[in-house]
UniProtKB/Swiss-Prot annotation:
Protein name: Small ribosomal subunit protein eS10B
Complex formation: Component of the small ribosomal subunit (SSU). Mature yeast ribosomes consist of a small (40S) and a large (60S) subunit. The 40S small subunit contains 1 molecule of ribosomal RNA (18S rRNA) and 33 different proteins (encoded by 57 genes). The large 60S subunit contains 3 rRNA molecules (25S, 5.8S and 5S rRNA) and 46 different proteins (encoded by 81 genes). eS10 interacts with GCN1 (via middle region); this interaction is direct and promotes GCN2 kinase activity.
Main location group: cytoplasm
Swiss-Prot/TrEMBL GO biological process terms: cellular response to amino acid starvation; cytoplasmic translation; positive regulation of protein kinase activity; positive regulation of protein phosphorylation; ribosomal subunit export from nucleus
PTMs per UniProt: The N-terminus is not modified.
Primary gene name: RPS10B
Record keywords, A-Z: Cytoplasm, Ribonucleoprotein, Ribosomal protein
Misc. comment: Present with 7650 molecules/cell in log phase SD medium. There are 2 genes for eS10 in yeast.
The protein's role, per its UniProt record: Component of the ribosome, a large ribonucleoprotein complex responsible for the synthesis of proteins in the cell. The small ribosomal subunit (SSU) binds messenger RNAs (mRNAs) and translates the encoded message by selecting cognate aminoacyl-transfer RNA (tRNA) molecules. The large subunit (LSU) contains the ribosomal catalytic site termed the peptidyl transferase center (PTC), which catalyzes the formation of peptide bonds, thereby polymerizing the amino acids delivered by tRNAs into a polypeptide chain.
Keyword Cytoplasm on entry: yes
Domain of life: Eukaryota
GO CC entries: cytosol; cytosolic small ribosomal subunit
One Pfam family, short name: S10_plectin
């Protein structure tokens, strides 16, 4: 599907930033809930990444759930010209500073 490159870049940037995208199965929806673009563009762009093996798709209750794979991280890092130390949000583990470290036996 032909779509403007700016729209594709928005989708790819959001996917890399978050690591996960949720899209409602509504092709006529004017705008995606989180990305400032058409919902159809989001579904089709991520469908393309799924066919290349960069994204894993799960469908449940009229919603598509897209998760980024290891190959997808490398592809988007190259596509968006990002350095190695930048990783998706799903790869970052937040640690509660008040919580003590777990003891290993």
């Amino acid at each position: 599907m032909l779509m403007p490159k700016q729209e594709r870049n928005k989708i790819h940037q959001y996917l890399f930033q978050e690591g996960v995208v949720v899209a409602k199965k509504d092709f006529n929806q004017a705008k995606h809930e989180e990305i400032d673009t058409k919902n159809l563009y989001v579904i089709k762009a991520l469908q393309s990444l799924t066919s290349k093996g960069y994204v894993k798709t799960q469908f449940s209750w009229q919603y598509y759930y897209y998760t980024l794979t290891e190959e997808g991280v490398e592809y988007l890092r190259e596509y968006l010209n990002l350095p190695e130390h930048i990783v998706p949000g799903t790869y970052i583990q937040e640690r509660n500073p008040s919580q003590r470290p777990q003891r290993r036996y």
